[in-house]
């Protein structure tokens, strides 16, 4: 059996009037991440962690922000495709552990819905997906509510 770990990171600027997509669900808030797709930083970090563990480059390589096919796309579509790609190479996802850094909105009330959305997109059990959130204690661009960061680790196994 082969076991590999991958790390992913993403950041997006927050803009007034943009929808707030995080973890595959839309949250009510006055700002949202700005980007080429729906700018779901959590899913993008998870995609990079999975791709990294499989040594398959990164999300920008496979879904370039210069390609209009991905403009405005639901990031769950990207995650499903990443999972298909790694499974085609014989990998399975053991678990994903992710953290969000943002001041608002509060994430804890939404974690179970995020886990469900991600579980469906990745075809893995909810209990294999951990999501945590923290603030930046009002420090830096995250603390000023100008941006949101996401970090993720994925463990892949190849029987």
Curated annotation (Swiss-Prot):
<feature type="site" description="Transition state stabilizer">
    <location>
        <position position="135"/>
    </location>
</feature>
<dbReference type="GO" id="GO:0046872">
    <property type="term" value="F:metal ion binding"/>
</dbReference>
<feature type="binding site">
    <location>
        <position position="44"/>
    </location>
    <ligand>
        <name>a divalent metal cation</name>
    </ligand>
</feature>
<comment type="subunit">
    <text>Homotrimer.</text>
</comment>
<feature type="binding site">
    <location>
        <begin position="134"/>
        <end position="137"/>
    </location>
    <ligand>
        <name>4-CDP-2-C-methyl-D-erythritol 2-phosphate</name>
    </ligand>
</feature>
<feature type="binding site">
    <location>
        <position position="10"/>
    </location>
    <ligand>
        <name>a divalent metal cation</name>
    </ligand>
</feature>
<feature type="binding site">
    <location>
        <begin position="63"/>
        <end position="67"/>
    </location>
    <ligand>
        <name>4-CDP-2-C-methyl-D-erythritol 2-phosphate</name>
    </ligand>
</feature>
<dbReference type="GO" id="GO:0008685">
    <property type="term" value="F:2-C-methyl-D-erythritol 2,4-cyclodiphosphate synthase activity"/>
</dbReference>
<comment type="similarity">
    <text>Belongs to the IspF family.</text>
</comment>
<keyword id="KW-0479">Metal-binding</keyword>
<dbReference type="GO" id="GO:0016114">
    <property type="term" value="P:terpenoid biosynthetic process"/>
</dbReference>
<feature type="binding site">
    <location>
        <position position="144"/>
    </location>
    <ligand>
        <name>4-CDP-2-C-methyl-D-erythritol 2-phosphate</name>
    </ligand>
</feature>
<feature type="binding site">
    <location>
        <begin position="36"/>
        <end position="37"/>
    </location>
    <ligand>
        <name>4-CDP-2-C-methyl-D-erythritol 2-phosphate</name>
    </ligand>
</feature>
<dbReference type="InterPro" id="IPR003526">
    <property type="entry name" value="MECDP_synthase"/>
</dbReference>
<feature type="binding site">
    <location>
        <begin position="10"/>
        <end position="12"/>
    </location>
    <ligand>
        <name>4-CDP-2-C-methyl-D-erythritol 2-phosphate</name>
    </ligand>
</feature>
<feature type="binding site">
    <location>
        <position position="12"/>
    </location>
    <ligand>
        <name>a divalent metal cation</name>
    </ligand>
</feature>
<dbReference type="InterPro" id="IPR020555">
    <property type="entry name" value="MECDP_synthase_CS"/>
</dbReference>
<keyword id="KW-0456">Lyase</keyword>
<dbReference type="InterPro" id="IPR036571">
    <property type="entry name" value="MECDP_synthase_sf"/>
</dbReference>
<comment type="function">
    <text>Involved in the biosynthesis of isopentenyl diphosphate (IPP) and dimethylallyl diphosphate (DMAPP), two major building blocks of isoprenoid compounds. Catalyzes the conversion of 4-diphosphocytidyl-2-C-methyl-D-erythritol 2-phosphate (CDP-ME2P) to 2-C-methyl-D-erythritol 2,4-cyclodiphosphate (ME-CPP) with a corresponding release of cytidine 5-monophosphate (CMP).</text>
</comment>
<keyword id="KW-0414">Isoprene biosynthesis</keyword>
<dbReference type="Pfam" id="PF02542">
    <property type="entry name" value="YgbB"/>
</dbReference>
<protein>
    <recommendedName>
        <fullName>2-C-methyl-D-erythritol 2,4-cyclodiphosphate synthase</fullName>
        <ecNumber>4.6.1.12</ecNumber>
    </recommendedName>
</protein>
<comment type="pathway">
    <text>Isoprenoid biosynthesis; isopentenyl diphosphate biosynthesis via DXP pathway; isopentenyl diphosphate from 1-deoxy-D-xylulose 5-phosphate: step 4/6.</text>
</comment>
<dbReference type="GO" id="GO:0019288">
    <property type="term" value="P:isopentenyl diphosphate biosynthetic process, methylerythritol 4-phosphate pathway"/>
</dbReference>
<feature type="site" description="Transition state stabilizer">
    <location>
        <position position="36"/>
    </location>
</feature>
<feature type="binding site">
    <location>
        <begin position="58"/>
        <end position="60"/>
    </location>
    <ligand>
        <name>4-CDP-2-C-methyl-D-erythritol 2-phosphate</name>
    </ligand>
</feature>
């Amino acid at each position: 059996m082969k076991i590999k770990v991958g790390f992913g990171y993403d950041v997006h600027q927050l803009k007034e009037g943009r929808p707030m997509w995080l973890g595959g669900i839309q949250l009510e808030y006055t700002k949202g991440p700005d980007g080429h797709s729906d700018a779901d930083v959590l899913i993008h970090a998870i995609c990079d962690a999975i791709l990294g563990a499989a040594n398959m480059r990164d999300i920008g390589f496979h879904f370039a922000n210069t390609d209009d096919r991905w403009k405005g796309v639901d990031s769950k579509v990207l995650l499903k495709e990443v999972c298909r790609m790694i499974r085609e190479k014989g990998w399975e996802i053991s678990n994903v552990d992710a953290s969000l850094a943002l001041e608002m909105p509060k994430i804890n009330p939404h974690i179970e819905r995020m886990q469900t959305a991600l579980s469906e997109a990745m075809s893995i059990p909810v209990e294999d997906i951990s999501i945590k959130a923290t603030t930046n204690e009002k420090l830096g661009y995250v603390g000023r509510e100008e941006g949101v960061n996401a970090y993720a680790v994925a463990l892949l196994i190849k029987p």
